[in-house]
C-alpha cells in the first residue's frame, strides 16, 4: 500500500519545492536584478525620505494640491492591506449619497467652478488605491490649485500636460495623471 503513496508524496514534495521555494526565489532575484525600482514598490524619495509610491494613491486634503480618486479602503484611506472596491452597485443609496457628498466637497472647495465634475473625482477605482486621475479631473482642479498657490493658470495647466502619461504601450487604457508626481512638481515650483 505504501508503494502506491510513494510517487504521490514524492511529486507533492518536488512540486512544493519548485512552486513554493525555487520559483519564488528565482522571480524575486530576477525582479531585483532587472527591475530593482519597481520590485521595491516604485518608491519616490526626496533627501533619503520616502514620500510615497507612484503605484498607490495618497490622500491630499489640502485644496492647494490636486486631489486623487476617493479611496474605497475604509476606515483608513489608501490602505493597501484593505484593497478592494466598494462593491456598491450604481443604484445603491449609500453610493449615491457618497457621490453627492464628494461633489459637494469639490464645489465647496472651488465655488466658482461650474463645470461638470469628472466621474473619477467622485467614484473609487476597483482597487480603491488608484494613484491616477484623468486629465479632465486634473483640468477641473487646475484653477483652484493655481489660485490658492498664487500661480498663473497656464503654468499649472502646463504642469498637468507635462505629467500626463499616455496610454500604456500606446493603446492600453486612457491617458492619466499621477497625482503624487504632479503634487510634488507643484511643490518644486516654489
Swiss-Prot record:
Subcellular location field: Cell inner membrane
State any single GO MF term: P-type potassium transmembrane transporter activity
One GO cellular component, as annotated: plasma membrane
Which key words tag this protein in UniProt? ATP-binding, Cell inner membrane, Cell membrane, Ion transport, Membrane, Nucleotide-binding, Potassium, Potassium transport, Transmembrane, Transmembrane helix, Transport
Give TM segment ranges: 7-27
Membrane topology, from the record: Single-pass membrane protein
NCBIfam families (UniProt xref): kdpC (TIGR00681), PRK00315.1 (NF001454)
UniProt function note: Part of the high-affinity ATP-driven potassium transport (or Kdp) system, which catalyzes the hydrolysis of ATP coupled with the electrogenic transport of potassium into the cytoplasm. This subunit acts as a catalytic chaperone that increases the ATP-binding affinity of the ATP-hydrolyzing subunit KdpB by the formation of a transient KdpB/KdpC/ATP ternary complex.
Q: How does it assemble?
A: The system is composed of three essential subunits: KdpA, KdpB and KdpC.
> What protein family is recorded?
Belongs to the KdpC family.
Q: What is this protein called?
A: Potassium-transporting ATPase KdpC subunit
Native species: Methylococcus capsulatus (strain ATCC 33009 / NCIMB 11132 / Bath)
Amino acid at each position: 500500500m505504501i508503494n502506491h503513496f510513494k510517487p504521490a508524496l514524492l511529486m507533492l514534495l518536488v512540486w512544493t519545492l519548485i512552486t513554493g521555494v525555487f520559483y519564488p526565489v528565482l522571480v524575486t532575484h530576477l525582479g531585483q536584478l532587472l527591475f530593482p525600482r519597481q520590485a521595491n514598490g516604485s518608491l519616490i524619495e526626496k533627501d533619503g525620505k520616502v514620500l510615497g509610491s507612484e503605484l498607490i494613491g495618497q490622500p491630499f486634503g489640502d485644496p492647494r494640491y490636486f486631489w486623487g480618486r476617493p479611496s474605497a479602503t475604509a476606515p483608513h484611506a489608501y490602505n493597501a492591506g484593505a484593497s478592494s472596491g466598494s462593491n456598491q452597485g450604481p443604484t445603491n443609496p449609500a453610493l449615491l449619497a457618497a457621490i453627492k457628498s464628494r461633489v459637494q466637497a469639490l464645489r465647496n472647495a472651488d465655488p466658482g467652478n461650474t463645470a461638470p465634475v469628472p466621474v473619477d473625482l467622485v467614484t473609487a477605482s476597483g482597487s480603491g488605491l488608484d494613484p491616477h486621475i484623468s486629465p479632465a479631473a486634473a483640468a477641473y482642479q487646475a484653477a483652484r490649485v493655481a489660485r490658492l498657490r498664487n500661480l498663473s493658470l497656464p503654468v499649472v495647466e502646463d504642469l498637468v500636460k507635462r505629467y500626463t502619461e499616455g496610454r500604456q504601450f500606446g493603446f492600453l487604457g486612457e491617458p492619466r495623471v499621477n497625482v503624487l508626481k504632479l503634487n510634488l512638481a507643484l511643490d518644486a515650483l516654489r
